Structure formats: C-alpha cells, structure tokens
C-alpha cells in the first residue's frame, strides 16, 4: 500500500486512505503538491515527492502552515522588532512579519534553527542577513530562472530600482523574497509570500508570475535547500 504523508513528520502524518497502485498515490500527491504532500509506503518510508525532493515538500508544508497561522492570528506587514518564528511563543507577540521574516520563520519550522537571531529575524532589504543564513545552512544558489523548483526561495529586484539617494553598498541587495510552490497554468506560479498586508491576509498559496519586471521585481537568483536524511 502507498499513502500520502508529510516527509520528516513520521508515519503519523500519513493520510488514512491508502492506494494499492503507486501511480494512483503519485497522482493524488500531485493534486496536493503545493501543501507538501509526498508518497510513502506502508512503513512510512519516503517513495516520491511531486516537488522534486522530500526537503522541498517539507518546506512547502511549513510555508502553508505558517501562512495559515499568520492569517488566522491577525499578523500585519512591517519591520518586525522580534524574530516572528520565536516571538509567536511569547505572552504578547507583536504579530508583525514581512517577506524575509516569513521565509526565515518557515525555515525555522522546517528545522533550520541554528543561527536564527531572536531579534529582527533574517532581514533582506538593504541587508545580507538572509542570504548569509542560507549559505551557512548549506543552501545552493540558483542563477537561472528556468531552473527554479518548488521549495526554492526566489529573490527579486536590484539596484536599478533603488532610491537614488541610497548609499552604494546597499544598492545591490534584492528587494523581495518568496517561496516558490511550483508552476500553475499559463506561465504562472504558485507562491507563498508575506510581502504586504494583502498577501498576509490572503489564503495561500497565491498564483502570480515568477517575476514582474515592470515593477522592478525581476528574478535575481534563488536558493535551494540541501538534501537531508
């Protein structure tokens, strides 16, 4: 028998209805790919991921979970003073998040807890903190937009659309980041994104173009999580 489950969450995470045929299980997982579901056997061993890897599906599962949590708990867009991944457990969380802090939060829930700062989180705007964290965590940089996969962190925008008065050292940093959840239809992509109040309050994943050059949000690069046991 084959089942749908969330990788790294054990056999307890599998859905109750099983499939005699592996291909039927794969088709069912494909229909739930943006939520992180994979195929396992009757013993809970990983068989297949529609996202390309168990790690990618694991990230998508937590992206959906965090996106739902933000919406249901009234989070607002802003420059968080505390790392929301840690602050959510405090007595009075500030409930402020942004595109970069959201990605850091998702990665924290997915097990990337080392080097996560308790204050400010992992900022992106005019800062290398998020990129440095990804490199330190073993993520691989992808420079070709045609090679992005589900679960990748997509970075957009650059110095051509920065404020003219911005000091030169800050002009090369990307301006936005989100988690790619894979292709949809008509050249669009699913994404998990906390770049505005409207996004935070929406049911995710959203469906948009991968980049928006007319808004200065064109693909810069992506980062992909390393494989793990």
Language-model-derived ranges and their functions:
Residues 18-23:
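Conserved beta-strand/loop element in small beta-rich adapter and peptidoglycan-binding domains
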Residues 11-17, 46-48, 187-190, 199-202:
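Surface-exposed loop/edge segments in extracytoplasmic proteins
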Residues 17, 58, 91-99, 143-146, ...:
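Extracytoplasmic/periplasmic, Sec-exported soluble proteins
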Residues 113-200:
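...with weaker cross-activation on analogous glycine-rich loops/strands in unrelated enzymes
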């Amino acid at each position: 028998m084959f089942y749908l489950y969330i990788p790294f969450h054990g056999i307890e995470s599998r859905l109750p209805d099983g499939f005699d045929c592996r291909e039927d299980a794969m088709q069912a997982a494909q229909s739930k790919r943006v939520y992180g579901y994979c195929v396992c056997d009757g013993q809970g061993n990983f068989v297949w991921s529609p996202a390309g890897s168990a790690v990618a599906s694991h990230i998508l599962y937590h992206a959906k979970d965090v996106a739902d949590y933000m919406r249901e708990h009234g989070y607002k867009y802003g420059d968080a003073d505390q790392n929301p991944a840690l602050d959510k457990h405090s007595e009075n969380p500030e409930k402020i998040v942004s595109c970069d802090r959201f990605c850091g939060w998702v990665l924290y829930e997915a097990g990337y807890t080392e080097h996560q700062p308790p204050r400010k989180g992992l900022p992106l705007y005019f800062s290398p903190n998020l990129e440095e964290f990804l490199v330190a965590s073993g993520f691989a940089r992808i420079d070709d937009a045609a090679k992005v996969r589900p679960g990748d962190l997509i970075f957009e925008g650059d110095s051509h659309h920065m404020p003219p008065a911005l000091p030169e050292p800050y002009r090369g940093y990307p301006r936005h980041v989100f988690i790619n959840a894979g292709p949809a239809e008509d050249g669009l992509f699913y994404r998990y994104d906390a770049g505005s109040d409207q996004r935070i309050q929406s049911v995710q994943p959203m469906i948009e173009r991968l980049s928006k050059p007319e808004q200065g949000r064109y693909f810069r690069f992506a980062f992909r999580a390393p494989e793990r046991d």
